[in-house]
Swiss-Prot record:
<dbReference type="InterPro" id="IPR011262">
    <property type="entry name" value="DNA-dir_RNA_pol_insert"/>
</dbReference>
<dbReference type="InterPro" id="IPR011773">
    <property type="entry name" value="DNA-dir_RpoA"/>
</dbReference>
<comment type="subunit">
    <text>Homodimer. The RNAP catalytic core consists of 2 alpha, 1 beta, 1 beta' and 1 omega subunit. When a sigma factor is associated with the core the holoenzyme is formed, which can initiate transcription.</text>
</comment>
<dbReference type="GO" id="GO:0000428">
    <property type="term" value="C:DNA-directed RNA polymerase complex"/>
</dbReference>
<dbReference type="GO" id="GO:0006351">
    <property type="term" value="P:DNA-templated transcription"/>
</dbReference>
<feature type="region of interest" description="Alpha N-terminal domain (alpha-NTD)">
    <location>
        <begin position="1"/>
        <end position="231"/>
    </location>
</feature>
<comment type="function">
    <text>DNA-dependent RNA polymerase catalyzes the transcription of DNA into RNA using the four ribonucleoside triphosphates as substrates.</text>
</comment>
<keyword id="KW-0804">Transcription</keyword>
<keyword id="KW-0548">Nucleotidyltransferase</keyword>
<dbReference type="GO" id="GO:0003677">
    <property type="term" value="F:DNA binding"/>
</dbReference>
<dbReference type="InterPro" id="IPR036603">
    <property type="entry name" value="RBP11-like"/>
</dbReference>
<dbReference type="Pfam" id="PF03118">
    <property type="entry name" value="RNA_pol_A_CTD"/>
</dbReference>
<keyword id="KW-0240">DNA-directed RNA polymerase</keyword>
<dbReference type="GO" id="GO:0005737">
    <property type="term" value="C:cytoplasm"/>
</dbReference>
<comment type="similarity">
    <text>Belongs to the RNA polymerase alpha chain family.</text>
</comment>
<keyword id="KW-0808">Transferase</keyword>
<dbReference type="GO" id="GO:0046983">
    <property type="term" value="F:protein dimerization activity"/>
</dbReference>
Length: 325
């Protein structure tokens, strides 16, 4: 009887557009499609290294709830637009860039003054609209990081210096926008109970979907190599206990789910501000929310399912220390 496990012999990459690809791998032993697909998806969404704006200083602005004369957007929307700029740094971990523009017109990411080792992937991204006499002067700090780091976590980190006008941003470093996977049937000779793993990956353009798969696989291999090197349980028994790690996805605000305005407002009315708050609610609890009907509930369930989450989940140590409410 053959005891060795099958390894994929076919790996195909199909481009579905700019920074969007479908990766097909087969054959796998039955069950391994879901085992590896889910592991890769979670690593791709939470653990990839990328770059993001982390701090912003705007001339004439003290806090994010301000407005600027001659600028169509208020500061909150201006910050959201700045977070949409995709940066890529070469051989450095952080940089501060400048955005200056005067006069009527559209301000785009291409107007940012860049250092020689800093690149903007989406220069056509719109940041603001200036009217006649309008002026914008912004300092943007861009850093290298991993996953998603809320601004309140960074704000209470090691750097406690208070600088008037400095606005700390929630930083989504991940170069991966969306990931989904499906497991289909595969056949090898007379065996028809095998798996074919199909992964659909969209990135920001900082890395290609193929490179994203490679990096996520390396992360998994590196983590699992610890188990392969086990020689006994004595060391593990002496290791200090750690509090359970919280998935960075759960620290994201519910606004990142891109729900309809009606659904988002209903959740906020119930003090549900983070995805971690939402997944702990049951369907019955949400249906008791004023103005939230079955249609909105189905929308919430579908959006959560696309990220591998469901309602009614249990979380330990929630909310984490330092999380704003």
């Amino acid at each position: 009887m053959q005891t060795s496990l099958l390894k994929p012999k076919i790996i195909a990459v199909e481009s579905l557009g700019e920074n969007h690809a479908k990766v097909v791998m087969e054959p796998f032993e039955r069950g391994y499609g879901h085992t590896l697909g889910n592991a890769l998806r979670r690593v791709l969404l939470s653990s990839m290294v990328g770059y993001a704006p982390t701090e912003v200083t705007i001339a004439g602005v003290v806090h994010e709830y301000s407005t600027l004369d001659g600028v169509q957007e208020d500061v909150v929307n201006l910050l959201l637009n700045l977070k949409g700029v995709v940066f890529k740094l070469h051989n450095r971990d952080e940089v501060t860039v400048t955005l200056r523009k005067e006069g009527e017109g559209v301000v785009t990411a291409g107007d940012i003054e860049l250092a020689h080792d800093c690149e903007v992937i989406n220069p056509d991204h719109v940041i603001a609209h200036l009217s006649k006499g309008g002026k914008l002067d912004v300092q943007i700090k861009v850093e290298k990081g991993r996953g998603y780091v809320p601004g309140n976590v960074r704000r209470y980190g090691e750097d406690t210096a208070k600088i008037i006008g400095r606005i700390v941003l929630d930083a989504s470093f991940s170069p991966v926008r969306r990931v989904s996977y499906a497991v289909e049937s595969a056949r090898v000779e007379q065996r028809t109970d095998l798996d074919k793993l199909v992964m659909n990956i969209e990135t920001t353009g900082v890395i290609t979907p193929e490179e994203a798969i490679r990096q996520s696989a390396r992360i998994l291999v590196d983590q699992l190599s610890v188990f392969a090197a086990l020689e006994g349980t004595e060391t593990a028994a002496e290791a200090p206990s750690r509090a359970p790690q919280i998935d960075p996805i759960l620290l994201r605000p519910v606004d990142d789910l891109e729900l309809t305005v009606r659904s988002a407002n209903c959740l906020k009315a119930e003090n549900i501000y983070y995805i971690g708050d939402l997944i702990q609610r049951t369907e019955n609890e949400l249906l008791k929310t004023p103005n939230l009907g079955r249609k909105s509930l189905n929308e919430i369930k579908e959006v959560l399912a696309s990220r591998g989450l469901t309602l009614g989940m249990k979380l330990e140590n929630w909310p984490p220390a330092g999380l704003d409410k």
